[in-house]
């Protein structure tokens, strides 16, 4: 962490010569373990240094301030980075930060806090220092950046239809085969999903709670649609094995973070090395998948007693039935900070909140069906409380849903992360709360996806060999430094690029179901980029029979296919999909045969063919 933050600080804009540094202390204090030494506020950048007593190796030093409106929010804080020793005996260290404060601004420094994690001590210094700006003027934020689209695709394309056809030799068939190759691999505990059969550089030979649930969601959709009795029984067996494996994980005494433990060995015992834990999205996504499986199982004529004994009732059947315990955990822990789905930072995350909300809402109905009315009421109450926190993530100044509601972490100054889009895909509860057509979601999808245009050189290749448009290569977030093996420069990911395709397909479906489109100031940049063939104006409304309605949705569909074509363009003819493709060359990078990549392709294909009204598509894939 220190090394990364140092790199981030070095990459920040240096304090200009015209900036003035205000000194508060020239030497370490005698009566405190932390003290602010100096600060400078210039050109929208806040720089500060502090003396920190060397009480432990694991340290977290945070400076808090109020914004330009003299309000303190979770955004108005910054983590300091180790610079050097500040005393000959190494008992004191000098730490610093250099962060942009645009668009929020700074009014006053409130306090600096030092957590010596390994010894459990917290130290702080109250400041209440009125900040004086010097040097260059604070820039006026231009948010969001308006990009001119490089293409105007429209409607479905035959090449993508052929690539995704329901046959064993298509990419859909290949993806399905490779996905199942990573479930119950030889020697692994039944019900486990290996993230990738990559055992070094990188070592992904583990089962992750979240990833496994997303893969099993695809398996459940196949189960729900299969006509082949042989295939249906196979999927059913795997899903019951998965449920039992989840219960075993819940009860593993070696799990350091208990129910929030994210990662297990293939024998289904907890990984106990250093890791980003807890990850509280996992119990939520597992509950969602298993509730949806339980409902599908009952719809197929399954026994409610079997559902209660092998899926739901964790109190009576703790070794095999995980749903109730997952729901109880989500209800009691949703407000606690946890690590994000990228396993990098601890905060309050939009993705985690949205999947937790869906779990609570689905769980409330399911618990009621199981006769567990007291738990059902509790889940409804907690879902309502969680829902009240979601508006906090919308930043009107940035015109963006923040991926996390907290200070800048790991140098992610843009606050842009594709996890917001993934949150809608995995956590939308079909109740118009942050739906696919929500203006704030559309604005965020536009900002996040276009943010990679200036990051990846491969984005300069905008068409394939036949001249068909390629969608934007999408990574996790623009400041990413994980390169698939180590840290250098981040790359586009297959699953995030295809997630944008699925997002657009599902947006079109939702607009068609609604029968109208209303353009707002917030959503206007989205429409101007992804439906540029219509001269959109804020305040315009298109009804289902209007040509602008039809043209706009055909444009979104065309961009959906363009994003799929981007993934296709960087996929070798063998159909093998890695985690990433190189930001410069476009060659596959990182873990080979990433299970989540195949799940993402299948999920996008299901959304596309549903939009095309291909009612037998999912059944045909399930029966392959």
UniProtKB/Swiss-Prot annotation:
Pfam families, per database record: Glyco_hydro_15
Entry-listed glycosylation sites: 54, 70, 98, 111, 168, 267, 333, 460, 582
Classification via InterPro entries: 6-hairpin_glycosidase_sf (IPR008928), 6hp_glycosidase-like_sf (IPR012341), CBM21_dom (IPR005036), CBM21_dom_sf (IPR038175), GH15-like (IPR011613), Glucoamylase (IPR000165), Glucoamylase_active_site (IPR046966)
Domain called CBM21: residue spans: 26-132
EC class (word): hydrolase
UniProt GO cellular component terms: fungal-type vacuole
EC number: 3.2.1.3
GO biological process per UniProt: polysaccharide catabolic process
Domain of life: Eukaryota
Leader peptide range in chain numbering: 1-18
SUPFAM superfamilies membership: Six-hairpin glycosidases
Catalytic site: 340 (proton acceptor), 343 (proton donor)
Entry annotated with the keyword Ubl conjugation: no
PANTHER family: GLUCOAMYLASE, INTRACELLULAR SPORULATION-SPECIFIC, TREHALASE
Protein name in UniProt: Glucoamylase
